[in-house]
Design a protein with these regions (language model features):
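Short Fe-S-cluster ligation motifs
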Residues: 55-72, 307, 345-369
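Conserved alpha-helical substructure of the radical SAM core
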Residues: 1-119
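Accessory C-terminal segments flanking Radical SAM cores
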Residues: 238-358
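Short beta->alpha junction loops/turns
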Residues: 22, 74, 101-102, 125, ...
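Radical SAM enzyme [4Fe-4S]-AdoMet core and its adjacent flexible, acidic
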Residues: 114, 123-125, 130-292
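Residues that line or immediately flank small-molecule/substrate-binding pockets and catalytic motifs
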Residues: 36, 72, 124, 192, ...
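Residue-level signal for the nucleotide or nucleotide-sugar donor/cofactor binding architecture
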Residues: 48, 79, 140, 168-171, ...
């Protein structure tokens, strides 16, 4: 006979772990929502031990694990990245990687390609070196990133190019699409700069776009620019702003929402957290992999259980009234908590759009009376 706990485990499997493998990064991106330490030659910062990585994966497989995301910091800087990739391959896990591409060698690219269903997101913030390197903070990183893309494509992996939109590079959007086409990438995603950690400072300095500009750009990307390319384009605004045809049906890309109820983060120091936000928000760190059983963390952490029972009924403000909330789940719980210290707070983008009359009325719950 199945117990209630067995049923609960099936209802909320641990689908994916986000491994933040390194505290250091070889770039110093001005918009980063995590703000890792810049790792120059001659200095080093903590990385996740390989044995601990393996132990976590072994425990997670009994909870439903099907894939892992390697991110950072910069995951390819991990001194044992080759061993980690081999282990993922041997465990038959789906592989997702977020990288700046700068040190993606042909050998590493081939290892990535040998894994199950590899998906690589690689950051390029402009189609020219000057603007990209202004964003990323290191001279020469543009050409190195291009080599990384080419190495992946040559190995048989078509990466997704990710561009973070800000005032300095807003005119580079179409250029990035054309560059991605020429490089043989698989898709392009346009991220909205979040007001978190370094990004928060950029918002305060006026280096980001207004909500009016962001909404207008999203409509242009999805309704016009996307028709000019065979690449799939993703503009990362909440589901309420996306045309139904872009989410559903044969040509739809899905809702592109966070799977917050089925993921867990592991930081470079071995801490369990909601995701990388644990580097900045201690409230969202749940335990230590070296001492706490993953099963206990997954099943008994108050925050995780609150999210399971509260999403989406407890969402507040405009998110609580949105017809897309069961798909969107508040867009980014980590961002909402960082800004408001409240799991149920509305997402800033939707809130700002609502204030200026740009939140789609057709996606709002009808008022009675």
């Amino acid at each position: 006979m199945n117990t209630n706990k067995d049923q609960e485990e099936r209802k909320y499997p641990l689908n994916q772990i986000y491994f933040y493998l390194t505290e250091g990064c070889n770039l110093r991106c001005r918009h980063c929502w995590i703000a890792p330490k810049f790792q120059e030659k001659g200095c080093s910062y903590p990385v996740l031990a390989v044995d601990l990585f393996k132990s976590i994966v072994e425990q997670a497989k009994t909870l439903g694990l099907s894939g892992v995301k390697l991110t950072g910091g910069e995951p390819l800087m991990h001194p044992d990245i080759s061993k980690i990739l081999d282990y993922i391959n041997n465990q038959d896990l789906n592989l997702y990687i977020e990288t700046n591409g700068v040190i993606c060698t042909p050998e590493i690219a081939q290892q990535i390609a040998s894994c199950k269903n590899p998906f690589v997101s690689l950051s390029l913030d402009a189609a020219d070196a000057e603007k990209h390197e202004w964003v990323r903070g290191v001279n020469g990183c543009f050409e190195s990133a291009l080599k990384g893309v080419k190495n992946l494509v040559n190995a048989g992996v078509k990466p997704q190019i990710i561009m973070c939109i800000m005032r300095r590079n807003k005119d580079e959007i179409e250029g990035i699409v054309r560059l991605a086409e020429s490089l043989g990438a698989g898709s392009v995603k346009f991220n909205i700069l979040q007001p978190t950690v370094r990004g928060e400072q950029m918002h305060k300095k006026g280096e980001t776009l207004t909500i009016e500009e962001l909404v207008e750009l999203g409509a242009w990307v999805e309704n016009s620019l996307s028709d000019s390319t065979d690449l799939r384009l993703f503009y990362d605004h909440p589901a309420a702003f996306r045309p139904m045809s872009k989410m559903f049906g044969d040509s739809g890309n899905g809702c592109s929402t966070c799977g917050v109820l089925g993921i867990l983060g592991v930081l470079a120091d071995g801490s369990y957290a909601l995701c990388g936000i644990g580097m900045s928000v201690p409230d969202l760190v749940f335990g230590e992999a070296s001492t706490d059983l993953l099963k206990d963390v997954w099943e008994t952490t108050d925050v995780l259980n609150e999210l399971r029972s509260g999403l989406t009924d407890r969402l507040e403000g405009i998110c609580g009234d949105c017809l897309m909330k069961n798909f969107c789940l508040g867009s980014c719980i980590a961002q909402n908590y960082y800004k408001n210290k409240n799991l149920w707070a509305p997402f800033w983008y939707c809130e700002e759009a609502g204030k200026v009359g740009l939140f789609p009325e057709t996606r709002m719950r009808p008022t009675v009376g």
